[in-house]
């Protein structure tokens, strides 16, 4: 962030089935020997799967990062992060292409955002990273509380950015209204999280919305 490493998010669950053999080379977050590291001339950088990045100047923006397979597990780490206050979960992924997987991935992202009453931002490896063994499609998704707000074109060979407006106020309101969310937070045993503040600040001036407000917001579209 602006020339400084705020923290290093580590993968919690490593797949070791079918075409995946990550445990041959890597270890999960639970095997970390320390909760800090020295990197790029910086000392004592927080490292782990327990980091929530909190933006100063933008109320309600608390970001958690998980990696690829973490989303495919029965209880993704982002569930615990959401119960600990995270409102936006991001997933840096290298989920390869197979028949029907895009629909399954889309459903996973939408459902996880609904379960956590959060935004979920998913960014997959691009087609240019494909090899003779596996192929990737550059699938990117932005979901908010069960709704897909934006989705990338798959298999694009051109650089692209997938953007969406996320309503943090709505998420806060929904979490307050849905009492079972706070009930789950009180009943669920979850690991402690470290919060890392950074001075993002809200942009100045008027910024056009990329998200339209429906004329009849209380009438279902279907």
What are these regions (language model features)?
Residues 1-222:
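Enzyme catalytic cores with a strong preference for nitrogen-chemistry domains
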């Amino acid at each position: 962030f602006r020339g400084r490493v705020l923290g290093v998010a580590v993968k919690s669950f490593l797949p070791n089935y079918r075409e995946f053999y990550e445990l041959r080379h890597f270890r999960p977050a639970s095997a970390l020997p320390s909760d800090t590291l020295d990197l790029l001339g910086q000392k004592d950088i927080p490292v782990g799967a327990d980091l929530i990045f909190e933006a100063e100047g933008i109320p309600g923006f608390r970001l958690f990062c998980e990696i690829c397979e973490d989303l495919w597990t029965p209880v993704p780490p982002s569930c615990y992060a959401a119960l600990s206050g995270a409102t936006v979960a991001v997933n840096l992924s290298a989920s390869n292409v197979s028949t029907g997987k895009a629909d399954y991935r889309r459903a996973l992202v939408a459902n996880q955002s609904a379960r956590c009453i959060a935004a979920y931002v998913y960014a997959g490896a691009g087609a240019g990273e494909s090899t003779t063994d596996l192929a990737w499609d550059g699938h990117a998704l932005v979901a908010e509380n069960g709704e897909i707000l934006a989705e990338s074109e798959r298999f694009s060979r051109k650089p692209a950015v997938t953007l969406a407006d996320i309503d943090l106020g709505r998420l806060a309101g929904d979490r307050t209204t849905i009492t079972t969310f706070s009930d789950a937070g009180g009943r669920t045993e979850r690991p402690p999280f470290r919060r890392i503040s950074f001075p993002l600040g809200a942009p100045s001036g008027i910024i056009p919305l990329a998200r339209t407000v429906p004329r009849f917001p209380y009438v279902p579209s279907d």
